[in-house]
Swiss-Prot record:
Assembly and binders: Forms a Heterooligomeric complex of two stacked eight-membered rings.
Key words of the record: ATP-binding, Chaperone, Nucleotide-binding
UniProt GO MF annotations: ATP binding; ATP hydrolysis activity; ATP-dependent protein folding chaperone; unfolded protein binding
InterPro entries: Chaperone_TCP-1, Chaperonin_TCP-1_CS, Cpn60/GroEL/TCP-1, GroEL-like_apical_dom_sf, GROEL-like_equatorial_sf, TCP-1-like_intermed_sf, TCP-1_chaperonin, thermosome_alpha
Protein name, per record: Thermosome subunit beta
Function: Molecular chaperone; binds unfolded polypeptides in vitro, and has a weak ATPase activity.
Domain of life the protein comes from: Archaea
Length: 545
């Protein structure tokens, strides 16, 4: 509300909240920092887990930053920007989500200190942008080229990604699976590799132990054969993939057939049977002994398929059909009548097996399959879910190295190198931007500090030791949280793709756009929200003051 000649002028509707200038910046920075503090304790191999309970009572236990923020019902718009940081990091690099969010939170904390010194947000943003650009150059210079055929390097990177998660005890076994899965689906394009993660299917089944998790060089489908009289095992499988129903098509128009005698009814039924039989005969004629159908299969068609010794599975998901095509070399056919022997795929074995009391179809022994399945096992639902998250991270990390061929030491080593080098760069810049660049360098130290703190070590003492060792021995020195001392992380096998820290800097820098906001205008809640309807509250300041 403004005043004009002593008269109040109402611009915004009643109930609207508005925060201006430093208040807006303070509230936004505080909201973002709360998000960073929430996930901070999960960082590193000694990080803690979070238990998240939704409104239905479903529980998620994890220390995966992206999962934690995804499961939380966050309302504040600035806090949502931090969630986007984690999502971007997960999408682009596959790991380092917590690192990106923690760095973003620390950059904002340092920015707030600069704002308190009356340094303009534009100067801070410019300084941070210069520092981030320099950080990318430094990461490129310290990255090591590796042979993407070196399975040992890939395995170490996968083990680093799994360490600290619930599946840690079996990390070597799971890392081997992750490496094999990526190598199997990697395709060479020119002189580089490309990995499409959609070709790696994760299938979860409770029961057994984590050690029972296995990689199937083919596809596992959570279905069963359509007819009890069908074969449950086919060796030397010739596989047909059909994405239409093996049923008599209903007309699209509202047509009526008037039947006046039993003979006409019999002829009608016989024609239906003939049409179904022709479909099945065509499948048999081309030499298929296994058929996967995306839609339904008529009871009569099931009978004939069983009679001819053809194994059939119906209502297979489109994504599974595509994976079957890539694994077996089959072509997906829309019309059965167009099926030819060239459209068939091959597998050494197609078999229905019981897993945890439920039937599943295993398609195995494919020649050079470009789609694979990881069947994840574990004692409880929570264990299976966490193993899946660990394997997803491991697979993405291996993918990054296979595609880029570059690694860096992990364990806080790159962040310490960046902090030291960016701080030296600040002296070259001068002006008020120098203060922002120095703040950026100081903010990066939050990673080694947090790694040490989460391991029960003294953060300051550990940081001083590590920086001293780093300056003396080089950019691969980081925090060994198990020994509680500085160590060469490359020698210890603690490595990460260079894409992870590079993307973390990019993602964190995006959150700095929060500093540009000097006015927050939040509309009042809708009436239906007041009555208990679903909708997010807009009272942003109340929880943050």
């Amino acid at each position: 509300m403004a005043q004009l000649a002593g008269q109040p002028v109402v611009i915004l509707p009643e109930g609207t909240q508005r925060y201006v200038g430093r208040d807006a910046q303070r509230l936004n920075i505080l909201a973002a920092r709360i998000i960073a503090e929430t996930v901070r304790t999960t960082l590193g191999p000694k990080g803690m887990d979070k238990m998240l309970v939704d409104s239905l009572g479903d529980i998620v236990i994890t220390n995966d930053g992206a999962t934690i923020l995804d499961e939380m019902d966050i309302q504040h718009p600035a806090a949502k920007m931090m969630v986007e940081v984690a999502k971007t990091q997960d999408k682009e690099a596959g790991d380092g989500t917590t690192t990106a969010v923690v760095i973003a939170g620390e950059l904002l904390r340092k920015a707030e200190e600069l704002l308190d010194q009356n340094i303009h947000p534009s100067i801070i943003i410019k300084g941070y942008a210069l520092a981030a650009e320099k950080a990318q150059e430094i990461l490129d210079s310290i990255a090591r080229d590796v042979d993407v055929e070196d399975r040992e390097i890939l395995k170490k990177a996968a083990m680093t990604a799994i360490t600290g998660k619930a599946a840690e005890e079996e990390r070597e076994y799971l890392a081997e699976i992750a490496v094999e899965a990526v190598k199997q689906v990697a395709e060479k394009v020119g002189d580089r590799y490309h990995v499409d993660l959609d070709n790696i299917k994760f299938e979860k089944k409770e029961g057994g132990s984590v050690k029972d998790t296995q990689l199937i060089k083919g596809v596992v489908i959570d279905k069963e054969v359509v007819h009890p009289g069908m074969r449950k095992r086919v060796e030397g499988a010739k596989i047909a993939l059909i994405n239409e129903a093996l049923e008599v098509k209903e007309t699209e128009t509202d047509a009526e057939i008037r039947i006046t005698s039993p003979e006409q009814l019999q002829a009608f039924l016989e024609q239906e049977e003939k049409m179904l039989r022709e479909m099945v005969d065509k499948i048999k004629e081309v030499g298929a002994n296994v058929v996967f159908v995306q839609k339904g299969i008529d009871d009569l068609a099931q009978h004939y398929l069983a009679k001819y010794g053809i194994m059939a599975v119906r209502r297979v998901k489109k994504s599974d059909m595509e994976k079957l095509a890539k694994a077996t070399g089959a072509k997906i056919v829309t019309n059965v009548r167009d099926l030819t022997p060239e459209d068939l795929g091959e597998a050494e074995l197609v078999e229905q097996r019981k897993v945890a009391g439920e039937n599943m179809i295993f398609v195995e022994g494919c020649k050079n399959p470009k789609a694979v399945t990881i069947l994840i096992r574990g004692g409880t639902e929570h264990v299976v879910d966490e193993v899946e998250r660990a394997l997803e991270d491991a697979v993405k990390v291996v993918k990054d190295i296979v595609e880029d061929g570059k690694i860096v030491a992990a364990g806080g080593a790159p962040e310490i190198e960046l902090a030291i080098s960016v701080d030296e760069y600040a002296k070259e810049v001068g002006g008020k931007e120098q203060l922002a660049i120095e703040a950026f360098a100081e903010a990066l130290k939050v990673i080694p500090r947090t790694l040490a703190g989460n391991a029960g070590l003294d953060p300051i003492e550990t940081l001083v030791k590590v920086i001293a060792a780093h300056k003396e021995k080089g950019p691969t020195i980081g925090v060994d949280v198990f020994e509680g001392e500085p160590a060469d992380m490359l020698e210890r096998g603690v490595i990460a793709p260079v894409r992870v820290p590079k993307q973390a800097i990019k993602s964190a820098k995006a959150a700095i756009m929060i500093l540009r906001i000097d006015d927050v205008i939040a509309a009042s809640k809708l009436e239906k929200d007041k009555e208990g309807g679903k909708g997010g509250t807009r009272d942003f300041g109340s929880d943050l003051d």
